[in-house]
Amino acid sequence: MLSEIALNRNDLPVNVLSENQTWLQLLIKRAVSGDTTAFEQIMIHSQQRVMTLSWRMLGNEADARDASQEVFLRVYKYLGRFKQDQDFFAWVYQITVNVCRDIAKKRQRHTERFASLDTTVEESAFEVPALQEGADEALIAAQQRELIAGAMATLPEKERAAILLRDIEGLPTDEVARILRSSSTTVRSQISSARKKIKIHCERHLWKKGGTRS
Amino acid sequence: MNCKNVEELLPLYVGRDLEEKSAAMVASHLQSCGHCAHSAQEYGEANQLLQLFEPPQFSEATYTAVRSRVLREIERESHKPQTIFALEFLRRPFQPRFMWAVSTALLLAVSLFAYYFIANHTNGPQERADAESRHDKLKDLAAPSGNDPKPVLPGKKNGETPGAIAKISHKPRFQQTAWHSRRAGGTPAVPVRTAQYSTTESKGTAPNTSLTSEKTLRLEMQTSDSNIRIIWFSHPATNEGSPNESSKGI
């Protein structure tokens, strides 16, 4: 009865799910015992996080889709090893980061894609002053997104993962260190270095060229 | 705290990753330094831009396709025949990670074996060479030559020249290393090596001719001075009391 109720809670937002650990634990138990319906529920409630992080790590939708598929297969395979006192989504993030690293190593395609994106950003950055007057805010926002994507592309893989988890996902430094299997000091150093590089990138491509400042 | 130090800490300060004490010091500096305050503002703006790093809105069809593929794969895995599992099990040893581990273990084992083999192989001949060199030295010491105050021992029964040691055991065995004091103060100064030799039948110089057929114990000590050598001969029956007592010193 409880499980039926649980399966009907499909429309719960992700942040509510993270607070309702009992409900999630129930789904996990059922999935471990081979219930694919329960596992599908787990996928539904974590797919957005996995896809988003994969896209941020890899830079394109096709790779993000492949990464998400591999992540969920690994989650299903190793769900029995998941400890109930762990944070499930931190565990999923850890798998996602590992999968994205594997995919990036195998394909080496994301570098070229980011590089082409970076070129686009550079070209568009020169056009920013012309857009100042009567600017279309949406277009500026798009350019800023491209700019920040270009900045992320310049980061080494470990720094990118650290700053994604810390500044965008908003995880505490210790949690980031646990996900990346590193020390807090190392993560802090990576984050500091990444922030410096992003600031320098923004200076070069936006602020010093008379672009928009938020 | 100067500007250089603050510049290093600013990336962590804007993300609130600094400890309270350091953060307070940076904040205090920012109030008085316009340059650093401007830099801090830029870090903040870069951080705001970072929040724009959003992926495009994925359609529900995309998510559904991912889930369907995952579930299909899980279904396929669950219906995999046992023979495929067996093949997977057989294939596992040839996976790169396993192969690396096995290769490393083999390399370590071979290295250890080679080390012990070489160590044993080189120590054996070395020890033999040392023993032979010691033997040669002692032979030199035993052989009468020039002005050395060597004892003249009776030769063999078959009439060899007296003075030659009839026989020296093949492997002279060092019994001890003693310290011979030559100074009045008794300060240990000169190492003296002693060696024991078994001689065969001796005669002539021994006062008691009846003992010529007895074994003679020769104890030789070489001081650091090559001109001084102490040699003791012992005949077991010379002293009636104890056969171990020395009978003659040269």
Regions found by a protein language model. Give the residues of each.
Chain A
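C-terminal edge and immediately downstream basic/flexible tail or linker adjoining helix-turn-helix-like DNA-binding
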Residues: 2-20, 112-122, 126, 141, ...
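Short, charged helix-capping/linker segments at alpha-helix termini
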Residues: 32-41, 51-70, 208, 213-214
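Sigma70-family region 2
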Residues: 32-33, 59, 72-87, 106-108
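Short helix-capping/turn signature of helix-turn-helix
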Residues: 45-48, 56-59, 164-171
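Residues within the DNA-recognition helix of helix-turn-helix
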Residues: 46, 190-193, 197
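Structural recognition of an alpha-helix C-terminal capping motif at a helix-to-coil junction
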Residues: 52, 66-73, 86-98
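Arg/Lys-rich amphipathic alpha helix in sigma70-family domain 2
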Residues: 80-84, 97-115, 141, 202-204
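Helix-turn-helix DNA-binding module
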Residues: 149-161, 165-186
